């Protein structure tokens, strides 16, 4: 349970950073951190964000992963997401 609380805290901090620094317009948490019944000790934080300039994406990934050395953040630019991933996000995602 503490790991889930930590993961969600990282997700919220990452969303704040992405909005303030990279001008993200929409950020959605998906995957096991958004679905507590699927969460386990090896879960990471899956985020999809729109509005991040593609030239700043690598820096954004580094910054969100620097928030917590124990918790990996998988960041996807919404503009580059596959239709299949977008369907998963629409079904199980939670806006931040």
Language-model region placement:
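Catalytic core of pol beta-like nucleotidyltransferases
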Residues: 1-26, 34-41, 50-96
């Amino acid at each position: 349970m503490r790991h889930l609380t930590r993961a969600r805290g990282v997700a919220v901090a990452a969303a704040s950073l992405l909005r303030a620094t990279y001008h993200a317009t929409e950020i959605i948490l998906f995957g096991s951190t958004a679905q507590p019944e699927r969460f386990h000790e090896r879960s990471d934080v899956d985020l999809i964000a729109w509005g991040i300039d593609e030239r700043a994406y690598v820096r954004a990934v580094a910054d969100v992963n620097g928030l917590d050395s124990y918790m990996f953040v998988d960041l996807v630019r919404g503009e580059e997401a596959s239709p299949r991933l977008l369907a998963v996000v629409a079904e199980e995602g939670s806006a931040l």
